[in-house]
Regions:
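Sec-dependent bacterial lipoprotein signal peptides
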Residues: 1-31
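N-terminal low-complexity, Pro/Thr-rich disordered segments
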Residues: 17-21, 31-95
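Glycine-rich, flexible loop segments associated with nucleotide phosphate handling
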Residues: 22, 127-129, 136, 221-229
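Secretory-pathway/luminal and periplasmic proteins that interact with or process carbohydrate-rich
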Residues: 34, 105-107, 244
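Active-site histidine-acidic residue metal-binding/catalytic motifs
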Residues: 84-178
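Active-site-proximal helix/loop segments of hydrolytic enzymes
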Residues: 142-312
Length: 312
């Protein structure tokens, strides 16, 4: 995870309808779906440089590095202009923005990503490095891999898919630009792909929903309900497709968590959620996250949830 360095705030009560719907899916999909809440669950900070992280660090960075303030006028969102006609399918005419969390080269640009940007209700770091498994598989590599799989699945159904980045930038994008890409694309849905960095024993996935936030440039009042629907659909299909249980340390067994401190959600004007696919610091979760077959299932679960949401 470490999409920011703050500890998640006190959890809010979930709407009964959302929790009930997910519980029904869980009962039919996987035993032991409702895990116990662990209030001690916290995010790790920056990724520890393991073997893969060290390899990433040795890669050459861009000769000219734009500052976070200049990032909105930087690179075009990846996939903004499809090079081939999309197939006709159930999602034809729909736009989905996929936001791969972090960037593999963020750790080479700590000065730039630590600069503060406006998130409407305050200021936060442009971006963070993300976490990694203990063996060094970086979250930023995981998020790109799953995002590519998800893009392919959605495009096969006719959706226009835009990535906020595709390992084609020296760092970032900053969290405010990530939100802006979704807004300017007039996305029907935005999904930010992540993996958590919590303590050993904390297992499972969770979906982060935007809280009702209004202040400065942030106003989520028009997307809270639709984002909750999107998140519940993704959570239910994620359980069904991957066989993974919802988080046992966040969300009270629902797989859903609401936060008002994330710029990527606060600044969104279109339905948006974050998906934390598992805990990279737990060996059992890490074994799943590093398995290509499981990552394909994770992408399929998200694609099915997005499609169910868009089809109503």
């Amino acid at each position: 995870m470490p999409y920011d360095d703050s500890v998640p705030p006190t959890r809010r009560a979930r709407p009964l309808l959302v929790a009930t719907a997910l519980a029904a899916l869980c009962l039919t999909a996987v035993a032991g779906c409702g895990g116990a809440q662990d209030p001690a669950g916290t995010d790790s900070g920056a990724a520890k440089p393991g073997p893969e992280a060290e390899a990433t660090a040795s890669a050459s960075a861009s000769a000219s590095t734009p500052s976070p303030e200049a990032s909105p006028t930087g690179a075009q969102p990846s996939g903004a202009t499809p090079t081939a006609p999309l197939p006709q399918g159930p999602l034809t005419g729909r736009t989905v923005v996929i936001d791969p969390g972090h960037n593999p080269r963020n750790r080479e640009h700590t000065k730039e990503i630590n600069q503060q940007v406006d998130i409407g209700t305050g200021r936060k770091e442009c971006d963070t490095t993300g976490t990694s498994t203990n063996a060094g598989y970086a979250e930023a590599r995981f998020t790109l891999d799953v995002s590519h799989r998800l893009r392919e699945l959605l495009q096969a159904q006719g959706a226009r898919v835009v990535l906020t980045h595709d390992d084609d930038r020296p760092f970032g994008p900053c969290i405010d630009e990530r939100a802006r890409i979704g807004n300017e694309a007039k996305a029907d849905a935005v999904v930010s792909v992540h993996a958590d960095g919590s303590a050993v024993g904390n297992r499972g996935f969770h979906v982060i929903l935007p809280a009702a936030v209004k202040g400065g440039g942030a106003d989520t009042s028009k997307i809270v309900k639709s984002s909750a629907d999107l998140g519940a659909r993704i959570a239910g299909h994620f359980v069904r497709t991957t066989g993974s249980a919802p988080s046992n340390y966040i969300g009270g067994g629902t797989g859903l968590d609401t936060r008002g401190d994330l710029g990527g959600l606060n600044l969104s004007t279109v339905p948006k959620v974050f998906v934390e696919c598992g805990n990279m610091r737990d060996p059992e979760d890490a074994a799943l996250l590093t398995d290509a077959g499981w990552r394909q299932k994770a992408a399929q679960g998200m694609a099915d949830g997005i499609a169910a949401y868009l089809k109503g």
